[in-house]
């Protein structure tokens, strides 16, 4: 698996990964209807803006299998193709995001987690920092100044 920066040619693949990950993994943490609404919310133009304006990294094994978006100190998105889940792709992408956040001078990483991904983030040192928002996303944070689960893990390039 290689990790590389996303570019404009990745937009459709990233949108497809996002949609399939949400529909495959969000239920039963949310209803099928809620998952459908979430999956259709961000179209390819949102992904194009993310690639242009933020750090977006893609995991590739011949084709794109996952991606992560970093906006300042925030992990704005992290999705892995359902056919590649539980193979460490998300962990490598999250480590890459944390490296990017640290390199930008931040000492804390922030994100909003869907209910189905909470355990993934908790196992990697994230803690809740507030109640869920109106859409059910939980605000999480991680101190990047101390060594903890998966910290210091250098992702493949």
Show the residue positions of the predicted features.
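Conserved beta-hairpin
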Residues: 54-66
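Conserved acetyl-CoA pyrophosphate-binding loop and the N-cap/start of the following alpha-helix
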Residues: 84, 88-96
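Conserved active-site tyrosine of GNAT-family acetyltransferases
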Residues: 121, 126
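A short beta-loop-alpha structural element at the N-terminal edge
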Residues: 2-16
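Conserved catalytic-core motifs of GNAT/GCN5-like acyltransferases
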Residues: 110-112, 127-141
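Conserved GNAT acetyl-CoA-binding A-motif
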Residues: 101-114
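Conserved GNAT-fold acetyl-CoA-binding loop/helix
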Residues: 19-45
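A short, internal acetyl-CoA/4′-phosphopantetheine-binding micro-motif in the GNAT/acyltransferase core
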Residues: 75-85
């Amino acid at each position: 698996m290689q990790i590389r920066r996303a570019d404009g040619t990745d937009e459709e693949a990233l949108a497809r990964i996002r949609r399939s990950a949400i529909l495959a993994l969000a239920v039963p943490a949310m209803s099928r209807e809620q998952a459908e609404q979430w999956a259709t919310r961000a179209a390819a133009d949102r992904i194009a803006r993310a690639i242009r304006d933020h750090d977006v990294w893609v995991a590739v094994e011949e084709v794109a299998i996952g991606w992560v978006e970093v906006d300042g100190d925030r992990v704005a998105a992290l999705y892995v193709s359902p056919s590649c889940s539980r193979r460490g792709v998300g962990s490598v992408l999250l480590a890459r995001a944390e490296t990017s956040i640290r390199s930008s001078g931040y000492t804390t990483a922030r994100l909003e987690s869907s209910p189905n991904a909470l355990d993934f983030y908790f196992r990697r040192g994230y803690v809740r920092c507030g109640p869920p928002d109106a859409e059910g996303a939980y605000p999480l944070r991680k101190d990047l100044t101390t060594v903890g689960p998966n910290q210091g893990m250098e992702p493949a390039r």
